[in-house]
Structure formats: C-alpha cells, structure tokens
Amino acid sequence: MIQATIRRSHDKGILSFEMTGHANFAEHGQDLVCAGVTAVVFGAVNAVIVLAGFEPLLDIGEDGGYFYFEFPESLDPEARQKAQLLIEGMIVSLETIERDYKDNLRVTTNII
C-alpha cells in the first residue's frame, strides 16, 4: 500500500508530504494505481517548480517507493501561495484515487 502523509502547520498550511510504499494493485509496469499516483505527484511537483518558480526540497527513492517534498523555510509569500494551491490540488486528486482504491492508497494528514 502507498502511504501518503501530509504535514500541515496549525494554520493548515502544507509544510511537507511524504509518499512511501507500493500500491501492489497489479504487476510492476501494469499497476494503474501506481501510475495514477505517480502522475499526480510528479505533475504537481513539476507545476510547483515551473509556475511558483522555486525548487522545493525533494528526496526521491532510487528504486521507487519513496518521495518526500518540503517547502523551503524562506520562501516568497506569493510563490508559497501558488505552490500551496497546486499541492492542495494534488491532495484532492490523491483522495479521489483513495476512494476507489482503499486497499492500495491511504492519505493521512498530521498537524504539527
């Protein structure tokens, strides 16, 4: 199962997110849940880089099964606002996948 953990501040702003595990919906290369989650996450992160104009802190597992995104502490408020909206859209998409594939994806939020 893919575990997606969203970390938010007390004011509900996104601080970071982490993805771990594998969907195990189908064989490697044929797993639609994995492909959907990967497309949503990489699409959102690429949009942040291009449209918000900054490089987030990223850690991507070499063999798959791990992805970490964190907002830099010093970030222009306008860029942060744009990126927050893009990542919120990613979360909506992940939760939509989770509704149909509960055994393969779990999205949780932690307030820190």
Swiss-Prot record:
- Lineage: superkingdom: Bacteria
Active site, renumbered: 22 (proton donor), 34 (nucleophile)
Q: Is the Protease keyword given for this protein?
A: yes
Name the UniProt key words of this record, in alphabetical order. Hydrolase, Protease, Ribosome biogenesis, Thiol protease
Q: Which residues form a coiled coil?
A: none
InterPro entries in alphabetical order:
Peptidase_Prp, Peptidase_Prp_sf
Q: Which EC class heads this enzyme's classification?
A: hydrolase
Q: What family does the entry list?
A: Belongs to the Prp family.
Query: What is this protein's function?
Result: An essential cysteine protease that cleaves the N-terminus from ribosomal protein bL27.
Kindly provide the name given to this protein in its UniProt entry: Ribosomal processing cysteine protease Prp
Species of provenance: Bacillus subtilis (strain 168)
Upper lineage is: Bacteria, Bacillati, Bacillota, Bacilli, Bacillales
